[in-house]
């Protein structure tokens, strides 16, 4: 399951970058079972179990308490690194993007593009206005698996769902147009949980391409972490490796530090602002507070400053 990124690598939902989509879905399942849930994703648990990664299936189904995966290096229960906060983290993230799409479509946007859609089931669970077209873009194996699994569950999309089975490193704009996408119409775009898995220059290309394909009035939502302070990158890698080691003790072999791209990069919000987008941003720490969740610990500065950004192309 574990592997370091390399040129031209591919994956399914049980390997490499693909399994992070399954992790995210497991967290959505956990968040859905919370006493006062912020989100309601009833497709998350069955999709995770269909993938079949044992640890994630047990987390999604409630058979494993995520606190069992914590250790003393996570700090207190309020730490963003603590697995017991995994569901809270994903709840506020999911709610943010859900509300972004619902607000965009209420404003009259009828064309939606979800980049790196993974096990995202928004095309099935959100109350889309009539006439909305949702394009899901991801690796062919990921698209095929989710489409089949949801059909087996008897699920029906609540919008017109069009799949675009293409690697984002390939000519995905051509594939998107071939599926019926019209760049002359305003679009609601999401790049959720994506930017950190791209090299810095690829992130810029992606944001440039989104801008090129956006008619005035288009909207975009994404999230990004600040560049690490001097010396912080190695500490972050060590922490990720420690978490991966604990996962291995439960039979889940994934090297998170080998999947993301480190190094200096343009932060998404100022980069987009310089390319014609009028933006708003909020930190994940602010989202926790706004949703009545216990605050993150002060030692989680970088995670607490994760910036959620949305805006309109002018």
Curated annotation (Swiss-Prot):
Protein name per Swiss-Prot or TrEMBL: Putative S-adenosyl-L-methionine-dependent methyltransferase MAP_4191c
Enzyme Commission (EC) number: 2.1.1.-
Residues annotated as binding S-adenosyl-L-methionine: 138, 167-168
Main enzyme class: transferase
Record function comment: Exhibits S-adenosyl-L-methionine-dependent methyltransferase activity.
Keywords associated with the record: Methyltransferase, S-adenosyl-L-methionine, Transferase
Superkingdom field: Bacteria
Gene3D superfamilies xref list: Vaccinia Virus protein VP39
Family: Belongs to the UPF0677 family.
Keyword check for Amino-acid biosynthesis: no
Listed GO MF terms: methyltransferase activity
Biological processes, Gene Ontology terms: methylation
């Amino acid at each position: 399951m574990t592997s370091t990124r390399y040129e031209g690598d591919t994956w399914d939902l049980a390997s490499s970058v693909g399994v992070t989509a399954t992790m995210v879905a497991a967290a959505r399942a956990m968040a859905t079972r919370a006493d006062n849930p912020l989100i309601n994703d009833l497709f998350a648990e069955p999709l995770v179990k269909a993938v079949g990664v044992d640890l994630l299936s047990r987390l999604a189904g409630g058979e494993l308490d995520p606190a069992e995966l914590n250790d003393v290096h996570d700090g207190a229960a309020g730490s963003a690194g603590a697995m017991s906060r995994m569901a809270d983290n994903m709840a506020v993230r999911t709610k943010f993007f859900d509300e972004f799409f619902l607000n965009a479509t209420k404003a009259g946007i009828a064309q939606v593009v979800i980049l790196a859609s993974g096990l995202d089931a928004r095309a099935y669970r959100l109350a889309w206005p009539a006439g909305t077209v949702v394009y899901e873009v991801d690796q062919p194996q990921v698209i095929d698996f989710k489409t089949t699994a949801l059909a087996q569950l008897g699920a029906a999309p609540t919008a017109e769902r069009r799949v675009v089975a293409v690697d984002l490193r390939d000519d995905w704009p051509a594939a998107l147009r071939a599926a019926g996408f019209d760049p002359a119409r305003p679009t609601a775009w999401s790049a959720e949980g994506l930017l950190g898995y791209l090299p810095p220059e690829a992130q810029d290309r992606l944001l440039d391409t989104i801008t090129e394909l956006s008619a005035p009035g288009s909207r975009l939502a994404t999230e990004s972490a600040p560049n690490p302070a001097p010396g912080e990158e190695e500490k972050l890698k060590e922490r990720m490796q420690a978490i991966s080691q604990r996962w291995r003790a439960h039979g889940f072999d994934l090297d998170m530090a080998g999947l993301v791209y480190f190094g200096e990069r343009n932060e998404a919000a100022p980069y987009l602002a310089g390319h014609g987008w009028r933006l708003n941003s909020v930190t994940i720490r602010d989202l926790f507070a706004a949703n009545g969740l216990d605050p993150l610990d002060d030692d989680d500065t970088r995670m607490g400053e994760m910036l959620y950004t949305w805006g309109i192309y002018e």
